[in-house]
């Protein structure tokens, strides 16, 4: 499904076995997917980016083809701080001591945490369809917040959300794709089938641990950084979908977190790499350079 020009490899970092797609040549570029997807979400933009970059697109720990240990009751093992550190080690193992990172959804949360915790490693940061975790929690009220059901449902104590997610994963995935996008047909049947195949009980465990970490750990890490005035130093591109009204204030939010921010809005909803690749790709290409 991913372009044939990319090689599929596995790398063990700590206790996580990462499935990684690698292709292209040039400056290293790490692409990080979100929920409920895998590296496959990048297949419409990765080939063009690989013309000028060495593109590395892993499945996040526990997602898709990447296996990882069970998380703790508060999501220990799946905090974005821990995930970011593992991926920095992965990039170092591949010979990349500095690199650009582009993240979508949960992957964008790993990406900005990476830029905060490892500023000497990150040359450029692009975040798609998010604001920082603590900012999101502080703004979840009213009608638009109904769309953020995973934040509280999947963070409930085990095993309730794992069982709910595993009971009918097709319904969960279709609901997310159909209600978070402006054009559900953009998430094509082949992609939906691949995401469904990847939604195993093991993956459900990891996803719930990811959301528990968001509730119990990640927002505390964000709160500490905000209180201490710690900001992202890397040039930062933020992109949101025009229909994401709950992110109308995203540019101002990101400018309080990063020193250099370029804010863009493109037609579409939450799944921009698949909904609007023709709009996202030029923005990324210009921002990342050759």
How would you label these PLM feature ranges?
Residues 36-44, 55:
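Serine-hydrolase catalytic-loop signature spanning alpha/beta hydrolases and amidase-signature enzymes
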Residues 44-53, 93:
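A short, Lys/Arg-enriched amphipathic alpha-helix followed by its capping loop at the start of a domain
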Residues 44-45, 250-253, 279:
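A short acidic, amphipathic alpha-helical/loop segment
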Residues 33-39, 61-63:
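Short, conserved structural micro-motifs that define repeat-unit consensus positions
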Residues 27-33:
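Short beta-strand element of the alpha/beta-hydrolase
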Residues 269-277, 281:
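Catalytic histidine-centered segment of alpha/beta-hydrolase-like enzymes
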Residues 1-9, 13, 17-20, 28, ...:
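Flexible "cap/lid" subdomain of the alpha/beta-hydrolase fold that forms the substrate-access gate
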